[in-house]
Each structure stands twice: as structure tokens, then as C-alpha cells.
UniProtKB/Swiss-Prot annotation:
<dbReference type="Pfam" id="PF04337">
    <property type="entry name" value="DUF480"/>
</dbReference>
<protein>
    <recommendedName>
        <fullName>UPF0502 protein YceH</fullName>
    </recommendedName>
</protein>
<dbReference type="InterPro" id="IPR007432">
    <property type="entry name" value="DUF480"/>
</dbReference>
<keyword id="KW-0007">Acetylation</keyword>
<comment type="similarity">
    <text>Belongs to the UPF0502 family.</text>
</comment>
<dbReference type="InterPro" id="IPR036390">
    <property type="entry name" value="WH_DNA-bd_sf"/>
</dbReference>
<feature type="modified residue" description="N6-acetyllysine">
    <location>
        <position position="80"/>
    </location>
</feature>
<dbReference type="InterPro" id="IPR036388">
    <property type="entry name" value="WH-like_DNA-bd_sf"/>
</dbReference>
């Protein structure tokens, strides 16, 4: 895929996308603002404790890759940063408000169910119902310039499948339920065969013993 982000780059871009919608009065963000956003505990998984230098390194890299741009002057005190990852004037990636909300939440929290995504993305976009969430996820998974989202195999004991963004490369699926059941079936079959052999050997020994007693 054209868009490849490290875990830290995904966190920085996710934070800028989030703040652009939820706190527009504070956007663009200063470097310190990005540090605070990256390390906040609410709506982050995993919770990070990045230093200013670590965040600054990510900001510099993303500016070089044209995913961010710096803003200065016109009343701004110091350099601030705004995202050019999507919906920028000359950028290729165009996303709807619903798509931005889901992508942002996935960038910030990793794999989640559609229900979790609807709840956690609510500050950015109010989905009418679960059908709209599922429809938007399907669109992201089937875009010609994507896919940007993948549905993961349902984990054992879980009622719902989770979704994950693909901006950090392919996602390794957890073992599917059917795969695990097949593995269990194979193990049971091997144990049954071993027991059958053991029973056959015991039967032979019993027959031999009875024959000996008969003599």
C-alpha cells in the first residue's frame, strides 16, 4: 500500500486527526500539544509515554513525507503542525467524515469491534446505527485505492469480529475458530488411534493369557 506508517507515526497522525475534529479551537497543534495528545490515557491503546524528542522525530519525519505541514506566523506562537494525511487540498486520500472517525479511532486504539468503534468514534462522528458503521467499514475495506481496513477472524470465545486499519502493513490474523477446532479434532483423532492400538495390544495379551490358562 502507498501509505505505510510506523506505530509512532500512526499515533501522531491519529492525534492530529482527532484534535482537528474534537478541539478545532486548539488546532493546529504545537509540538508540546502533540506530545500531550500522544500520551493521554483516554481513548489510547496502548497508553504511551513518549518524550518530546521522540515526538519531534516523528513530526520531522512526517513533514518530510508530506503527511504533515508546519504552520507559523499569523498569531501562532512558535511552529504548529497540521495533518495532510487526508482531505488536504492537493492530497490523494479523500475520506468522508464517517471514514475519518473510524480510521482515527483505529489508528489510536488498534483492532476493535464495530460496536466499540461506534462508541469510541462518537465525538468525531455520530453514526445513525450499527448498519452505518458496518457499511462504512465495508467501504474502507473495498476502496479501489485501498484497502484501508480489514476484518479479522473472530477469536475463540468472542461474539464479534474485530477490524484493523492497514496503514501499518498487513495484519496477522489470530487463529480462526475453525482452524482451532480442526487442530483439536486432529489431536483427538490421534489420541483415539493411540487408545485403539493400546486396546488391541491388551486384547492380544488377554487372549494369549486365556489360551495359556486353557492349556
Amino acid at each position: 500500500m502507498k501509505y505505510q506508517l510506523t506505530a509512532l507515526e500512526a499515533r501522531v497522525i491519529g492525534c492530529l486527526l482527532e484534535k482537528q475534529v474534537t478541539t478545532p479551537e486548539q488546532y493546529p497543534l504545537s509540538a508540546n500539544g502533540v506530545v500531550t495528545a500522544c500520551n493521554q490515557k483516554m481513548n489510547r491503546e496502548p497508553v504511551m509515554n513518549l518524550s518530546e524528542s521522540e515526538v519531534q522525530e516523528q513530526l520531522d519525519n512526517l513533514v518530510k513525507r508530506h503527511y504533515l505541514r508546519t504552520v507559523s506566523g499569523f498569531g501562532n506562537r512558535g511552529t504548529k503542525y497540521e495533518q495532510r494525511f487526508c482531505n488536504s487540498e492537493f492530497g490523494d486520500l479523500k475520506l468522508s467524515a464517517a471514514e475519518v472517525a473510524l480510521i482515527t479511532t483505529l489508528l489510536l486504539r488498534g483492532a476493535q469491534t464495530s460496536g466499540e468503534l461506534r462508541s469510541r468514534a462518537a465525538r468525531m462522528y455520530e453514526f445513525r446505527d450499527m448498519a452505518e458503521v458496518e457499511s462504512t467499514l465495508e467501504q474502507l475495506a473495498n476502496r479501489e485505492d485501498g484497502p484501508f481496513v480489514v476484518r479479522l477472524a473472530r477469536e475463540p470465545g468472542k461474539r464479534e469480529s474485530r477490524y484493523m486499519h492497514l496503514f501499518s502493513g498487513e495484519v496477522e490474523d489470530p487463529p480462526a475458530v475453525t482452524d482451532m477446532l480442526n487442530a483439536v479434532d486432529g489431536d483427538l483423532q490421534a489420541r483415539v488411534e493411540a487408545l485403539e492400538i493400546e486396546v488391541a495390544e491388551l486384547k492380544q495379551r488377554l487372549d494369549s493369557l486365556l489360551a495359556h490358562l486353557g492349556d
